[in-house]
Amino acid sequence: MAVKIKLKRLGKIRSPHYRIVVADSRTRRDGRAIEEIGLYHPVQNPSRMEVDAERVAYWLGVGAQPTEPVLAILKKTGDWQKFKGEPAPAPLLVAAPKATRPSFDALGGDDAGKGEAITQKKKAEKKDEAAAESSSSESTEA
């Protein structure tokens, strides 16, 4: 059985995501795969490439042939050079980590803002008004 390492397309129109899979060479592009060994997301900047190096080395060792796009990915990650015994390429560009927002606890959490309410509740206002009216009516009657 001829085995190929190829890309399986996922995602929406104009938003492709690929899985790097090992499949029989006669199966269709998005058909049944023997094993999934990586990811490739070309739309992200820089492109996201994750490859399970151990599984790639195994499949290349037993004779699986990578397609041209997969071969380019393997060369960028250095797995192809490792398999061939050549020097490794320059390291890949890694995305800068996003700035994290300060956590709720770091800003003081619930404890910082606790105190008495600035505005009074409506029920309390009505009770105060009713008490004031009843006391004023008692003082006028007496």
From Swiss-Prot:
Where is the segment annotated Disordered? 101-142
Which named protein is this?
Small ribosomal subunit protein bS16
> Which Gene Ontology cellular component terms are annotated?
cytoplasm; small ribosomal subunit
Q: Which GO terms describe its molecular function?
A: structural constituent of ribosome
Q: Which GO terms describe its biological process?
A: translation
Q: Which domain of life is it from?
A: Bacteria
Positions the record marks as coiled coil are none
Entry's family note: Belongs to the bacterial ribosomal protein bS16 family.
**UniProt keyword terms in alphabetical order:** Ribonucleoprotein, Ribosomal protein
Q: Which organism is it from?
A: Streptomyces avermitilis (strain ATCC 31267 / DSM 46492 / JCM 5070 / NBRC 14893 / NCIMB 12804 / NRRL 8165 / MA-4680)
**Residue ranges with Low complexity bias:** 132-142
